[in-house]
Curated annotation (Swiss-Prot):
It comes from Lactiplantibacillus plantarum (strain ATCC BAA-793 / NCIMB 8826 / WCFS1). PROSITE patterns: AA_TRNA_LIGASE_I. This is Valine--tRNA ligase. ATP binds at K535. Belongs to the class-I aminoacyl-tRNA synthetase family. ValS type 1 subfamily.
């Protein structure tokens, strides 16, 4: 049921009162669900599912605000809209949070066991999913909760299993022993893009590797020199390599050296991998601890010796160092090498070291048996698709190049994770034969099989999000048929390789279509100094705190108005103050309009023949704004749309049209009053509709307080182009009047004269069109410029003593005597003259001092000369002005 209009609006905008209960009302009215109108064009967005690791941050607020603006506008434009909500289980991140919580209680996941630990994670998920939904409500997001999904829902889990099994059967998923990135704190494999490289202090350790043949020397030495940054992996060395084209070391190939500390012989081999220009041109080969060494080892059939446990402590292969942490082992080995005279030197360096994105610990390259996706065929398909009609449109366009570059240089994707929270890999191993079974449902004799304990990378299920949430693999599902592919994805550019790229290749592989028509990539939220917000820096801001102080609409306005595709945005409370002030301006303007509408049922524009110049102008400006906002929204240029709205509302509507309406509304002409009331109501109604996608709460409150038709702005029609409103002449004429009135106000302000004081106003112009405009609209000039006499024409003679403003095709004069007391002006100018004379004398004396000119820096001397010249010019003008005023007085 629609709320009744009211004129009882508080004098000040109170976001808490405005927003209270409104969201629940929208939900009760079922306004966020698709219309179900089969004749309407569908428009769908799936929310990038936030991780259930914790509360939403400002980045989420920005991301979802942009999506809500899009979906609200499309809904108002008559599209059959679906904005599908959901959340991500976020395997490693959520498990790490729960493990940290348990550690505070002195408990590990191993103490609980898999089943009880997973229940703890589900409890965590339920707690934070509830918090996230409360935050969505506070933000005013128009999500269809009847379709809410979670990446570990039964339906989505079925999709995950089907994709895994199908890729396996196609030969695109395989299991093997390879070097992978290993997080020793989470004790799981990581993909390349889950590794963040940071500059760390380290060292090159130059170590002697003695020849096995004690009688052999090379360059007069019984050893070769090997430089390494990781002496802790030495116990896993199985060769030393040189480049086959490196003539310096040809005689060494085939020789053997003694591995220091291990006293084990290893060969010197030739392999093109070695860069002869780097270091000594000789490198140690550790196939179990380096991806490049692993490849070299495969080519030369070298043994793989893993020297670390999964927590990065040393294992039995490390000999006496077994049980030590890797960094403790490094120190111990370095000391032993020094004690045995095997350390030549240590050179400190700063080098790039991989760290886990989630735990921030240094990642290990580790030999491990894992599941992988063979990426080349999938990447090639995605690249080919970008050349056709079904290509994904990247906004900004430059990110398509980043996408292509990543696809062209892609590595196989390690998808298994040694975690407990996530989608269990649908693979089983026969307890007797070791045979592998991969299937959606599992073996029929489960007692003879053991399921792989690992889970899938979080991004594996997230990559299916656009179509799995629509009912796939059931391709006959109504939502899948109507709303897939989705229209727009809005997300941060930082997850282009993690998520966007993977959704594209998985969607193409399993549906034959792109997952979304376009992807809008925004930047990061930074603080007012340009520093990325983070918990560790303590500069993060809770969006709920901002909403509590300023309201959701102000935050949404700031986030949308500061948005330029692909760019970062800086948060500042100064900008939030400005956002609140703008909404307060809208509130007060609306209050004025509503209080002056009388008993109107609904706004109806008067006949065009009854429009005043002000009416014609405001309707033309409104239509220009409608077209500009619609166009910029279609381009996802929210910042430009916001600027257009701000300029029209603040400048055109509030500062001018409302002011022009006041005399009419208080006048005796009933018809003119009714006409102005209707134009005011119509324009305000259109403003509220234009603003609603950005500021849903306050616009709804105001709209329901004024005469209206319909239950909610949520489903009201969005403004459209009215060509009959376009009026270039009215816009030009009003622009001239505004420029004139502004010029008169500037003169008064400069003279510190009252704005309402009556003055002689002279306008000199030989533009006959401009003369006609000013003469035809003397009532506006009288109302806003307050002239006691008005002279307009080409023959207007400028008073000898007047204040002047130049405007387009005209000069504006007001006699000085009408603005100021000439005797007082003389006194003021004489004081200024004395000040300038003193300054000129000071500078002249200083520049006449030869020691100053000779010894002071050149820029200081030049600055003093410039000041003197400037003050001399001002003094001369001041003296002439005094002469003129005294002559007049």
């Amino acid at each position: 049921m629609s709320e009744e209009p009211t004129t009882d609006m508080p004098t000040k905008y109170d976001p808490t009162a405005v927003e209270a209960g409104r969201y629940q009302t929208w939900l009760d009215q079922d306004l966020f669900k698709p219309s179900g109108d089969k004749k309407a064009k569908p428009y769908s967005i799936v929310i990038p599912p936030p991780n259930v690791t914790g509360k939403l941050h400002l980045g989420h607020a920005w991301d979802t605000t942009l999506q809500d603006i899009i979906i609200r506008q499309k809904r108002m434009q008559g599209f059959d809209t679906l904005w599908l909500p959901g959340m991500d289980h976020a395997g490693i991140a959520t498990q790490a949070k729960v493990e940290a919580k348990l550690r505070e209680q002195g408990i590990s996941r191993y103490d609980l066991g898999r089943e009880k630990f997973i229940q703890q994670v589900w409890d965590w998920k339920d707690e934070y999913a509830s918090i996230i939904k409360q935050q969505w409500a506070k933000m005013g997001l128009s999500l269809d909760y009847s379709r809410e999904r979670f990446t570990m829902d039964d339906g989505l889990s079925d999709a995950v299993k089907k994709v895994f099994v199908d890729l396996y059967n196609k030969g695109l998923i395989y299991r093997g022993e390879y070097i992978i990135n290993w997080d020793p704190q989470a004790r799981t494999a990581l993909s390349d893009i889950e590794v963040i490289h940071k500059d760390d202090k380290g060292a090159f350790y130059h170590v002697k590797y003695p020849f096995a043949d004690k009688d052999y020397t090379f360059n007069g030495k019984h050893y070769i020199e090997i430089a390494t940054t990781r002496p802790e992996t030495m116990m896993g060395d199985t060769a030393v390599a040189v480049n086959p084209s490196d003539d310096r070391y040809k005689e060494l190939v085939g020789k053997k050296v003694i591995l220091p500390l291990a006293e084990r012989e290893i060969p010197i081999i030739a392999d093109a991998y070695v860069d002869p220009e780097f270091g000594t041109g000789m490198v140690k080969i550790t196939p179990a601890h380096d991806p490049n060494d692993f490849k070299v080892g495969n080519r030369h059939d070298l043994k793989r010796i893993n020297t670390m446990n999964d927590d990065a402590s040393m294992n039995a292969n490390a000999g006496k160092y077994e049980g030590m942490d890797r960094f403790e082992a490094r120190k111990a080995m370095v000391k032993d090498l020094e004690d045995q005279d095997l350390m030549i030197k240590i050179d400190p360096i700063v080098h790039s070291v991989g760290h886990s994105e989630r735990t921030d610990v240094q990642v290990e390259a580790r030999l491990s048996t894992q599941w992988f996706v063979k990426m080349k065929p999938l990447a090639e398909q995605a690249l080919k698709n970008q050349e056709g009609d079904d290509a994904v449109d990247f906004i900004p366009k430059r990110f398509e190049d980043a996408f292509k570059q990543w696809m062209e240089n892609i590595h196989d994707w390690v998808i298994s994770r040694q975690l407990w929270w996530g989608h269990r890999i649908p693979a089983w191993y026969n307890k007797t034969t070791g045979e592998t079974y991969v299937g959606v449902d599992g073996p029929k004799d489960p007692e003879n099989w053991e399921q792989d304990p690992d889970v899938l990378d979080t991004w594996f299920s997230s990559a299916l999000w656009p179509f799995s949430t629509m009912g796939w693999p059931n391709t006959d599902a109504e939502d899948f048929k109507r709303y897939f592919p989705t229209n727009t994805l809005v997300t941060g550019y930082d997850i282009l390789p993690f998520w966007v790229s993977r959704m594209i290749f998985q969607s193409l592989e399993f549906t034959g279509r792109r997952p979304f028509k376009n992807v809008l990539l925004h930047g990061l939220i930074r603080d007012e100094h340009g520093v990325k917000m983070s918990k560790s820096l303590g500069n993060g801001i809770d969006p709920m705190d901002v909403i509590e102080k300023y309201g959701a609409d102000a935050l949404r306005w700031f986030l949308s108005n500061g948005s330029t595709a692909g760019q970062d945005v800086r948060f500042s409370y100064t900008k939030m103050d400005a956002a609140w002030n703008f909404i307060n301006k809208i509130w007060n303007a609306s209050r004025y309009v509503i209080m002056n509408l009388g008993t109107m049922d609904k706004p109806e524009l008067p006949a065009a023949s009854d429009w005043t110049l002000a009416d014609k102008w405001i309707l033309s400006r409104l239509n220009a704004t409608v077209k500009q906002v619609t166009t910029t929204f279609d381009k996802f240029d929210f910042g430009e749309a916001g600027r257009a709205l701000y300029n029209f509302i603040w400048n055109d509507f509030c500062d001018w049209y409302i002011e022009m309406s006041k005399e009419v509304l208080t006048g005796d002409d009933a018809q003119a009053k009714a006409n102005t009331q209707n134009v005011l109501a119509y324009v305000l109604d259109q403003i509220l509709r234009l603003l609603h996608p950005i500021m849903p709460f306050v616009t709804e409150k105001i709209w329901l307080s004024m005469p209206h038709v319909g239950e909610s702005l949520v489903v009201a029609a969005y403004p459209v182009d009215h060509p009959e409103f376009d009026d270039e002449t009215a816009e030009s004429d009003m622009a001239s009047l505004i420029e004139l009135i502004t010029a008169v106000r500037s003169i008064r302000a400069e003279a510190n004269a009252k704005m309402s004081s009556a003055v002689d106003l002279l306008i000199k112009t030989d533009n006959t069109r401009l003369q006609a405009v000013f003469k035809a609209n003397e009532d506006y000039i009288q109302r806003f410029a307050h002239p006691k006499t008005l002279s307009i024409g080409a023959d207007v003679v400028a008073p000898k003593l007047a204040m002047t403003q130049v405007i387009s095709d005209a000069e504006v004069y007001i006699p000085l005597a009408e603005l100021v007391d000439l005797d007082e002006e003389v006194k003021k100018l004489e004081k200024e003259q004395a000040k300038f004379e003193s300054e000129v004398a000071r500078a002249t004396k200083k520049l006449g001092n030869e020691r100053f000119v000779a010894n002071a820096p050149e820029d200081v001397v030049n600055s003093e000369k410039e000041k003197l010249a400037d003050n001399q010019t001002k003094l001369a003008a001041l003296k002439q002005r005094l002469v003129d005023i005294k002559a007049e007085a």
